């Protein structure tokens, strides 16, 4: 019997990616405090990609504890600019600060995914993308945030590449799915290997 697939996420974008791929799954948000997990890692000097892996694993493990006979997919994404790690902005002023810091420079997205079953990590994967934002004026940032509003608070970096955020960039290197926070091609390959989807 094929195990039930569960996405350990409340993200509508991650759900959309899995739905668009034709996967049959349930989505259940992980009951973890992400900041409580990542703060000690960051304080210890963990790299942003390592933090993403730990969070992806933690989300999948928590949901797996509630649905032990399922294959649980956890994912997370961190964003870094040099040694600085960015988190989702807390308000529109914070979003403006993020966009000002990213203006005219290249930053990195680190997207991690893990599969857990019965509390055991079966697989994990990390992918990276490099994004270069075009130079933005303070006035343009204000107009952009006025248009997108609270949506800017739902992603690290205060942009949503799948929407108006694409207008902020001049160069992107990396897989589209990695940028959206769920590396679909390696995930689908692993799900086929595990017999969870037809292949």
Curated annotation (Swiss-Prot):
Which cellular component appears as one GO term in the record?
cytoplasm
Q: Which Pfam families match?
A: Maf (PF02545)
Q: Where can this protein be found?
A: Cytoplasm
Its UniProt entry gives the catalysed reaction(s) as:
N(7)-methyl-GTP + H2O = N(7)-methyl-GMP + diphosphate + H(+)
Q: What InterPro entries does UniProt report for this protein, alphabetically?
A: ITPase-like_fam, Maf-like
A GO BP entry: nucleotide metabolic process
- Named cofactor requirement(s): a divalent metal cation
> Which EC main class describes this enzyme?
hydrolase
The enzyme's E.C. designation: 3.6.1.-
Q: Which residues form the active site?
A: 76 (proton acceptor)
For this UniProt record, the keywords arranged alphabetically read as follows: Cytoplasm, Hydrolase, Nucleotide metabolism
Q: GO molecular function, one example?
A: nucleoside triphosphate diphosphatase activity
Superkingdom assignment: Bacteria
Family (UniProt): Belongs to the Maf family. YceF subfamily.
Against PANTHER family, the record matches this protein to: BIFUNCTIONAL DTTP/UTP PYROPHOSPHATASE/METHYLTRANSFERASE PROTEIN-RELATED, BIFUNCTIONAL DTTP_UTP PYROPHOSPHATASE_METHYLTRANSFERASE PROTEIN-RELATED
Protein name (record):
7-methyl-GTP pyrophosphatase
Upper classification of the organism: Bacteria, Pseudomonadati, Pseudomonadota, Alphaproteobacteria, Hyphomicrobiales
